[in-house]
């Protein structure tokens, strides 16, 4: 980031919107969506969760609220908003969706669409005990600092994957979540 502080207005002016996917026509059974919640503050924050240790997949990992698209979802955006409400009690009407990032393929076979939205600073988060162990906020300027992410090349089932690693306080941010944050940084013009 440049030396001046990252304000919400500055973030929004640099965010180059992609056309949001609004219909279900392109969806198949392996689609998922996550909400990338930017907290509206003079110096914005990025809301993240730590998944419950009891979950079958990605237990204990830092993640954005989100999950698989289900039959009731009219769109990928609707899926992200529903999941955010289920996991951390963010009301869909409180989210100002500003766009989507390119979909990411997960190691579990889902194509995950990150939905970027602005949320008010005074929301009372209530973590779903079955899914979320903790909810925390990271300063957006710090989250988007590309130098904080370190690559790790792994080989799985004969395929090469590059994942990104970082720490924030006592939280280990890596994998798809770190990749989505990096993509957001690149989307607003940060240089690697």
From Swiss-Prot:
Pfam families: NUDIX (PF00293)
Domain Nudix hydrolase: residue ranges: 29-160
Swiss-Prot/TrEMBL keywords: Hydrolase, Magnesium, Manganese, Metal-binding
PROSITE patterns xrefs: NUDIX, NUDIX_COA
SUPFAM superfamilies named among the record's database cross-references: Nudix (SSF55811)
GO MF annotation list: coenzyme A diphosphatase activity; magnesium ion binding; manganese ion binding
Motif (Nudix box): 67-89
CDD domains reported in the protein's UniProt record: NUDIX_CoAse_Nudt7
Record's keyword annotation contains Magnesium: yes
InterPro entries in UniProt: CoAse, NUDIX_hydrolase-like_dom_sf, NUDIX_hydrolase_dom, NUDIX_hydrolase_NudL_CS, Nudix_NudL
Requisite cofactors: Mn(2+); Mg(2+)
Any single GO BP term: nucleoside diphosphate metabolic process
EC numbers, comma separated: 3.6.1.-
HAMAP family, sorted: Nudix_NudL
Cited function: Probably mediates the hydrolysis of some nucleoside diphosphate derivatives.
Protein name, as recorded: Uncharacterized Nudix hydrolase NudL
Annotated organism of origin: Cronobacter sakazakii (strain ATCC BAA-894)
